Amino acid sequence: MSTRPEEAGNIKVGSFIVIDGEPCKVVEVEKSKTGKHGSAKARIVGIGFFDGGKRSIVVPTDARVEVPIIKKFTAQVVAFVGDNVQLMNLEDYSTFEIPMPQEEEIKSKLSEGVEVEVWEVMGRHKIMRVRA
């Protein structure tokens, strides 16, 4: 898996972390003060990048959490195969299939030959936008 460690206290809203093995975009971060016993805690809430599920964790602020490494590249739509889209990476010309995006504004603009921006997160791909 392509992740790197990061201290929980350094996580900001809008960044990405791995919660329960799923990459998530952070939507809320709460930090509690240190008490009489114990260290400060961080409560991090994230929305799943691929499934849209809401997840949260509570960890000490000095604990290490996994941050996914996101690779962004341009691909071209080659064909539609059932509920999948076949894409060709424009950097190395390799082809791969991914599920059809759920977002209607992306799905409506897809057609063969169109260039799209793809994010690769932890070995999985997602179309983020259609290039004009």
Curated annotation (Swiss-Prot):
UniProt function note: Functions by promoting the formation of the first peptide bond.
UniProt feature coiled coil, ranges: none
The name this protein goes by in its record: Translation initiation factor 5A
Membrane-spanning intervals of the chain: none
Keyword Cytoplasm: yes
Principal place of residence: cytoplasm
Sample GO molecular function, one term: RNA binding
Residues that bear Hypusine: 36
The keyword Cell inner membrane is assigned to this record: no
Keywords: Cytoplasm, Hypusine, Initiation factor, Protein biosynthesis
GO CC annotations on file: cytoplasm
Subcellular location: Cytoplasm
InterPro entries from the UniProt entry: IF5A-like (IPR001884), IF5A-like_N (IPR048670), NA-bd_OB-fold (IPR012340), Rib_uL2_dom2 (IPR014722), Trans_elong_IF5A_hypusine_site (IPR019769), Transl_elong_IF5A_arc (IPR022847), Transl_elong_IF5A_C (IPR020189), Translation_prot_SH3-like_sf (IPR008991)
Family designation: Belongs to the eIF-5A family.
GO BP of this protein: positive regulation of translational elongation; positive regulation of translational termination
Originating gene: eIF5A
